């Protein structure tokens, strides 16, 4: 076979019989695998399995398979949420704003805590207050973090009657401070130290006057008193007593040998009021951001945010997403990668990728990498800091910016794919699905406002308005639309036979076009067998349009029955 004919048969996926060598070509079009769309590629240059339109179908079996319809309404919220979260059992949390939520990293947390940022200030809630009553949940929350006391203890040495300091060398100099403790056992940073206290006679009691706990919503119910102890040339603060928060007076007569552990929460500050983007890394470290500052909590203590655990980026941060013990930080400029086994060892580096993040809600963790909506397409970043424009080969920058409105993307990972709801230029919502393995996209005709992926049951629940349903959770198949590439033949050809392989051909609709003119249109219910005779038609550019509710495994066009491939 001449090289030109062989090359043409590969490029145009037309199988030529040996008679082609003698100048008699008998081609056929045989589509044996089906995939999604690659809008960047000219339709006639697409791979034979690609489509120019793929809607409400998937290709997990390598063929056209209808997605199931969305399920019926499973739950109706009292608000129109922008964020939902499955707390446990039948309890669903919903917020009218974009909210970032994490579960408590504490092992077997008896309180059932979750932590979240909602754009107002960081919060924590627990089962005892979140699920009370009826209506929208969570029913209540506390401000995240424990504030430091603002007033120092007032100290008075209680000298006994007639007691004298006979040995000035045993005088003890002390300072006192206190911390607040929440009902969950979370201890905050210490307040200011007291004035110097000199105890001339050993074990002389010291009377402490404490200030009331300020009005707050941090769930503070206790306070801890510490006093300084010198030893080895260094001073430390050791625990004297733990008191109810309402106690305003205490007498310290505890011998030094009976003091408790040293103060360990010096820098356990509450997170900043404007922190958002809360997420949890694999090593128990929570992360968030505010402006161009990314911050990390102490490990397994999401209420404690030391200032030394903060880092800055050149541009304002748009979104953050954990990958194992690393954190991908997408900004209005280049992305960053922060890594470390503990908060104090975390360091960051800028990733050389000129792709700003255009949508905070577009950033999701896939399997081993993160995807977010960049300037020119979806950007992929892995835990090693390797960045790439994931959709470069299938969507052009112009198509991305004009057709997909990246600033509007709200995305979720499900079944290894990137499910993105966005607003089209005409204001209507649409959904596209990016398959990183297949490197194609497809569309779904079920737009939504927000969603939540249930990994245990492999269900993606979506909310439209106030109603929650399961994506592809219905019993009936969706109406598919799949349009093949345009097969450009070397010369005008007349195909006379159409074969459609399907387990349910009666549920499949087929339209064949020649040079954009319909040759045959078979609505669902018209096919009773697999082979159909085509009306006489000649064309150079052929295309097949699939519709209906049935799976399609193979589509073949041939010039005669005898030329149909096995």
Give, region by region, the residue ranges found by the protein language model.
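Beta-sheet repeat architectures centered on beta-propellers
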Residues: 5, 10-11, 15-118, 203-205, ...
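Surface-exposed extracellular loop regions of Gram-negative outer-membrane beta-barrel proteins
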Residues: 327-352
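Short loop/turn segments that connect beta-strands within the blades of beta-propeller domains
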Residues: 110, 117-120, 174, 282-283, ...
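Disordered, low-complexity "stalk" and linker segments at domain junctions of extracellular
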Residues: 8, 14-55, 59, 75, ...
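Structural motif
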Residues: 121-128, 292-299, 333-339, 376-382, ...
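Short loop/turn segments immediately following beta-strands, especially the blade-tip
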Residues: 129-133, 181-185, 230-232, 340-344, ...
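Hydrophobic core register within WD40 beta-propeller blades
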Residues: 278, 320, 363, 451-453
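A short beta-strand motif characteristic of beta-propeller blades
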Residues: 265-268, 304-311, 347-353, 398, ...
